[in-house]
């Protein structure tokens, strides 16, 4: 049986609206004995809230089945003084991190949501403070570096754009905690006790997830849902193992490869 990493936003749902056939496909993969791990770069809601949302759609999973960037950040930055540009909802998941307004030894940048909160989190003054902290020697960390994500209203600017701005202004490269970092993929495979060459990454994100998974030695399935753009695929040097219409086709595809 295969080990499968499932992206969430754009694969299972878009803005909370389930992708047709997603619940049935995931359930079938479980019944057929495949090992599944949900891996998301969503950094605007707690893991508990994200799990509850998926359960509400009909998915069966435990909290530990969902790998999130705030939980990973807490493990990586625990005990450090951190100036964090993040949504308030994820603060409970940053257990062990000392959140400070100045004299930080690390700056952490999260993602955006569809509310007005990013207007405050990523204000000029907050970005300027992050710039100053990095200039003073703080390390720069990003929960992810996605420049945008797909919503029901269309593409929306994401936190990766602000990460790039801070990198440009400071000359400091961010350490990425979520996908496509090697650490993120390594943690996911360790949870499944899986080898990269026997693992599939299922996603709608060509440049972050597909490219990153391939560099880590995994096989990849790109779905034509969520943020998928045909023109981006045509222009890209990244070639997934297969392009499927949606997650509904994944069980049949995986089974044919075994």
Name these PLM-found stretches.
Residues 2-8, 13-23, 27-34, 43-67, ...:
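Asp-based, Mg2+/Mn2+-dependent phosphohydrolase catalytic module
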């Amino acid at each position: 049986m295969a080990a499968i990493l499932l992206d969430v936003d754009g694969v299972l749902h878009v803005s909370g609206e389930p992708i047709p056939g997603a619940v049935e496909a995931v359930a079938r993969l479980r019944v057929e004995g495949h090992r599944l791990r949900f891996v998301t770069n969503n950094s605007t809601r707690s893991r508990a809230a994200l799990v509850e949302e998926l359960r509400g759609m009909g998915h069966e999973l435990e909290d530990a089945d969902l790998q999130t960037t705030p939980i990973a950040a807490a493990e990586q930055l625990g005990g450090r003084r951190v100036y964090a540009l993040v949504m308030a909802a994820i603060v409970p998941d940053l257990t062990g991190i000392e959140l400070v307004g100045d004299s930080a030894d690390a700056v952490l940048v999260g993602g955006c949501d569809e509310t007005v909160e990013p207007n405050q989190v990523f204000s000029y003054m907050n970005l300027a403070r992050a710039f100053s902290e990095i200039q003073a020697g703080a390390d720069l960390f990003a929960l992810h570096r996605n420049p945008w994500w797909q919503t029901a209203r269309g593409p929306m600017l994401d936190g990766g754009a602000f990460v790039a701005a801070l990198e440009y202004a400071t000359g400091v490269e961010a350490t990425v905690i979520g996908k496509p970092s090697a650490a993120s993929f390594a943690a996911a495979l360790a949870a499944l006790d899986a080898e990269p060459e026997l693992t599939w990454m299922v996603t709608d994100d060509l440049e972050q997830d597909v490219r990153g998974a391939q560099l880590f030695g995994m096989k990849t399935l790109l779905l034509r849902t969520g943020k998928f753009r045909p023109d981006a695929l045509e222009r890209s040097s990244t070639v997934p193992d297969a392009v499927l219409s949606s997650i509904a086709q994944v069980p049949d595809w995986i089974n044919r490869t075994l």
